[in-house]
């Protein structure tokens, strides 16, 4: 397990990244059926690339060729499935507050990103 947090400010703003390696796919397979495919979302790929630069980490989330994701807008209390909804949250919202969980099929790895500004 890899975990890094950078929180601060009056409202506990910031970002958290957790990575879980060698996850038993059989334990989460029932969840993945309702998640979106990662290769259909350039927005999710962009978020994952920018997480490492936010922290200034040597650790870089690799490009995920095959997997699934679940993106939840914590401010609106709803799951975001379309690129239009994701772009509205990231580009046009005053309160960016989301949880992102990504499953990498090839590496059996889960990436969790919590972001609040």
Language-model segments: which ranges?
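Short, small-residue-biased leader/transition segments that mark boundaries at the very start
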Residues: 1-2
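Secondary-structure transition/turn motif
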Residues: 22-24, 114-117
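Functional cores of ribonucleases/endoribonucleases
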Residues: 34-109, 114-116
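Terminal, regulation- and interaction-focused segments at domain boundaries
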Residues: 9-38, 44
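Residue-identity detector for glycine
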Residues: 8-9, 14, 56, 67
């Amino acid at each position: 397990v890899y975990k890094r947090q950078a929180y601060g400010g009056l409202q506990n703003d910031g970002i958290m990244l957790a990575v879980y390696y060698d996850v038993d796919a059989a334990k989460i397979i029932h969840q993945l059926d309702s998640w979106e495919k990662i290769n259909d979302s350039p927005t999710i790929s962009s978020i994952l690339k920018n997480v490492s630069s936010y922290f200034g980490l040597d650790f870089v989330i690799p490009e995920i060729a095959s997997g699934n994701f679940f993106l939840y807008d914590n401010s609106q209390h709803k799951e975001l499935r379309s690129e239009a909804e994701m772009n509205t949250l990231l580009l046009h919202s005053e309160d960016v507050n989301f949880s992102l969980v990504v499953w990498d099929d090839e590496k059996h790895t889960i990436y969790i990103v919590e972001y609040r500004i």
